[in-house]
Amino acid sequence: MRATLDNPKFTNVATADEYLADEVFGINVEVNGAHRFYSYQILNWHQVVNDNFDGKNLTVTYCVFCRSFAVFETNKKFDLDGRVYNNNVLIKDRENNSSWLQIRGLSVIGNNVGEKLNQYQAESITWSDFKKLYPEGEVLSTDTGFVRDYTRHPYASYDTIKTVYFPLTNFNDVFDKKDLVHGVDLGDVQIAFSEYIMRNVPVETVDYKGHKIVGFLDEVGVIRIFKNITLGETELDSKYLPKNVPLDEVLDFTYDPKKDLMIDNQTGSKWNRKGEVIEGPLLQKKLKQLESVETFWFCYSAMFENAVIADINAIEFNKQ
């Protein structure tokens, strides 16, 4: 069984750069403006890190089979359960041995069945991007107390081959098994944004069953999903409102590749990758970012059998 890390040690960017590969991804966690990087090079071997970051008790988790990460703000301490469901690892809390699905933070076995953990916002980026964006950040150290070769993947080329190790209850073959998607759970519906699609269309606005959301793909390949708003909800002064556009029309966006910005087509305001207006009539407006999961498609389609997929035009949804 993979060994959990408790009270992990951290190092600086310069030291970590000696052993981390530029192209390898990891989890970027921000607390009060400070950043920590938990590299998959290390998480491949451990998968659960119980940490305290500037007073916040966080459990950082990674499923090596689904390539899914999740960070939870919780006082519970977790270990790997040793079992999987649809290839997603179960984690077990030490307090009462309840088992939880890693990708959903949902208790499925034990005294806490049905309870959900509080997900803490985080993102997956490459080491190359992290060290450029956050040169003062802290980095999970290889000084873990365990003897591991952190320069290699314990499952070799698993991330790039088509093989899936364990049975699936469902698979939707609209994408290849190991295509990456970002999914958001809206209660009555789950919506998946495909990295494959968004590399060509970096912004997708959707209005489905009353849910208004928009996905942005930023310059370092991170997909962020936000709750969208209507023109009326912008509270824009009437003198700036476009003519003949109904107030209940949802904002739609166009990507400007030269400036790496999103421009809403109703007001011409310019939005950055964090969902913030930096120029235009809606200056200082900010969209609310929604919790989402990043994982291989085979895992998401098995976990959320009725999930719908934002298509390339972000107008319709396909379920095949």
Regions found by a protein language model. Name each.
Residues 1-320:
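Mid-to-C-terminal functional-domain signal that highlights helix-capping/loop sites
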